[in-house]
């Protein structure tokens, strides 16, 4: 059996389990189910790589499902791929996902090492610090874990003290306490430095481009990302009007240069029928998986601005073109040529 035949006959064995229903009507900030895509050639044969067959009436290339196989030999699925199209639209915009304001990027996170005794004492509680919104029960459990870890170091501490500071065994307890802090800090530091940093900034597969990267075009370097969108509605927030826009399948906060145009209020709900141009300022991924996007409305030119651009002088090119000969000279040359032919 060739590799192509093996891949053609292979089936999906397991995916991430999801207990949420396919027709979930609650508030969703991110896709909840994995999407399966098939190519047009395999869609004609109703081949999805699943254990059970899909009805022939399904014409969509994208499926979301919960169970690969049931007792009835049926896959619980829905022909829905809306999130897939949103991802493709976002990738076409080419906007990079940036970290939230005030949050340090873990890819360039600087892990400081304790240098003096005050930092050493603080590093003992590195494992106990955790998140700010941790519950008291979880903090108590973590404290119990750290206490058991410290007690397990008693024999090692005695050996370390005899080996490095044998004369300090006769000193008072205050001096001995400093050596305990030094020893525990050394043990905890060696363990925490080897631990892999699990805090990462995900992009949800929306974009893998880096911020600040230049994008070229036939007209030069692209400095701004301008995309079409539609004004949705106005939301009251802190006694101010907050305008929202639909851009690439996402809802973005609209920023104006000065103030919203007066025509927006007069158009009412019919404003959604008109398309405007927006400049994407920033797109970030929140902790709950939602995408926060800010865009600036590029207002159309008014009459004065359009008149100013029309009155600009048109500069002639520096390289002069060859002057064309008048048509009269061409006719005379043709007549002379005919006379020469007739004379021969």
Swiss-Prot record:
> One Gene Ontology cellular component annotation?
mitochondrial inner membrane
Report the superkingdom from the record. Eukaryota
Pfam families to which the protein is assigned, alphabetical: Mit_ribos_Mrp51
Question: Which keywords annotate this record?
Answer: Mitochondrion, Phosphoprotein, Ribonucleoprotein, Ribosomal protein
Recall the GO molecular function terms of this protein's record: structural constituent of ribosome
Q: Does the keyword Phosphoprotein apply?
A: yes
Q: Name one GO biological process term.
A: mitochondrial translation
Q: Where is this chain's protein located in or outside the cell?
A: Mitochondrion
The PTM Phosphoserine maps to 327
Does the UniProt entry include the keyword Ribosomal protein?
yes
In the UniProt annotation, what is the result of changing residue 235 to A? Suppresses defects in the 5'UTLs of COX2 and COX3 mitochondrial mRNAs
State the oligomer form and interacting partners.
Component of the mitochondrial small ribosomal subunit (mt-SSU). Mature yeast 74S mitochondrial ribosomes consist of a small (37S) and a large (54S) subunit. The 37S small subunit contains a 15S ribosomal RNA (15S mt-rRNA) and 34 different proteins. The 54S large subunit contains a 21S rRNA (21S mt-rRNA) and 46 different proteins.
Q: What does the similarity note say?
A: Belongs to the bacterial ribosomal protein bS1 family.
Miscellaneous note of the record: Present with 656 molecules/cell in log phase SD medium.
What does this chain do?
Answer: Component of the mitochondrial ribosome (mitoribosome), a dedicated translation machinery responsible for the synthesis of mitochondrial genome-encoded proteins, including at least some of the essential transmembrane subunits of the mitochondrial respiratory chain. The mitoribosomes are attached to the mitochondrial inner membrane and translation products are cotranslationally integrated into the membrane. bS1m functionally interacts with the 5'-UTR of mitochondrial mRNAs.
Kindly provide the name given to this protein in its UniProt entry.
Answer: Small ribosomal subunit protein bS1m
**Gene name in the database record:** MRP51
């Amino acid at each position: 059996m060739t590799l192509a035949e093996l891949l053609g006959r292979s089936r999906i064995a397991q995916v991430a389990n999801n207990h949420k229903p396919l027709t979930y009507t609650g508030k969703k900030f991110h896709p909840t189910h994995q999407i399966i895509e098939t190519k047009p050639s395999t869609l004609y044969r109703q081949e999805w790589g699943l254990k059970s067959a899909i009805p022939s009436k399904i014409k969509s290339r994208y499926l979301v499902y919960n169970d690969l196989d049931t007792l009835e030999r049926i896959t619980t699925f829905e022909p829905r791929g809306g999130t897939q199209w949103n991802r493709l639209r976002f990738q076409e915009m080419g906007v990079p996902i940036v970290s939230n304001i005030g949050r340090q990027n873990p890819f360039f996170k600087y892990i400081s090492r304790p240098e003096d005794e005050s930092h050493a004492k603080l590093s003992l509680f590195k494992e106990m610090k955790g998140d700010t919104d941790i519950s008291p029960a979880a903090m108590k459990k973590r404290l119990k874990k750290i206490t058991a870890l410290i007690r397990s170091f008693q024999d090692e501490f005695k050996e370390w003290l005899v080996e490095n500071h044998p004369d300090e065994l006769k000193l008072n307890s205050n001096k001995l306490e400093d050596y305990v802090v030094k020893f525990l800090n050394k043990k905890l530091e060696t363990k925490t430095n080897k631990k892999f940093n699990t805090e990462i900034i995900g992009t949800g597969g929306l974009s893998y481009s880096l911020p600040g990267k230049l994008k070229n075009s036939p007209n030069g370097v692209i400095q701004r990302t301008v995309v079409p969108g539609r004004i949705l509605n106005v939301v009251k927030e802190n006694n101010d009007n907050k305008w929202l826009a639909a851009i690439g399948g996402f809802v973005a906060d609209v920023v104006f240069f000065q103030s919203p145009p007066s025509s927006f209020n007069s158009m009412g709900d019919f404003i959604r029928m008109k398309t405007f141009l927006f400049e994407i300022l920033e797109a970030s991924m929140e902790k709950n998986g939602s995408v926060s996007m800010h865009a600036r409305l590029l207002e159309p030119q008014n009459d004065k601005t359009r008149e100013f651009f029309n009155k600009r002088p048109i500069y002639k090119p520096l390289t002069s073109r060859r002057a064309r000969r008048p048509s009269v000279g061409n006719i005379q040359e043709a007549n002379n040529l005919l006379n020469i032919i007739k004379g021969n």
